[in-house]
Amino acid sequence: MARIAGIDLPNNKQLQIALTSIYGIGRARALEICRKTDILPEKRAKDLDNDEVNKLRKIIESDYVVEGKLRSELAMSIKRLMDIACYRGLRHRKGLPLRGQRTKTNARTRKGKRKTVANKKMAAK
């Protein structure tokens, strides 16, 4: 089992798919990594030898920001927006959509489960 960037790659999957189990690597980037290391993307992860695993590890660690470092960069970016109190930071703080979507009827995913207001119908009358 190949271990790259602190993640065990699934053995039975093709390399291009197995690499996507690393946070920060999608299909396009996985193919790019395979092309840089001259390893066939269709090769199974269990069939990789130590040289190939070391090549992959070296390319990923030197050229790409993945896993914990990427997560912390994203968190710091959001924290910076909240600290400078810009519009996007305020929306992050309130847990609302950032990019101009309507919130009167939609945005349930971002806002969370509905919170019922007691006696709302009585107040409307």
Curated annotation (Swiss-Prot):
One of its GO terms (cellular component) is small ribosomal subunit. Keywords: Ribonucleoprotein, Ribosomal protein, RNA-binding, rRNA-binding, tRNA-binding. The keyword Transcription regulation does not apply. GO terms for biological process: translation. Residues 99-125 are annotated as: Disordered. One of its GO terms (molecular function) is structural constituent of ribosome. It holds the Pfam family Ribosomal_S13. Located at the top of the head of the 30S subunit, it contacts several helices of the 16S rRNA. In the 70S ribosome it contacts the 23S rRNA (bridge B1a) and protein L5 of the 50S subunit (bridge B1b), connecting the 2 subunits; these bridges are implicated in subunit movement. Contacts the tRNAs in the A and P-sites. Belongs to the universal ribosomal protein uS13 family. Part of the 30S ribosomal subunit. Forms a loose heterodimer with protein S19. Forms two bridges to the 50S subunit in the 70S ribosome. This is Small ribosomal subunit protein uS13. The gene is rpsM.
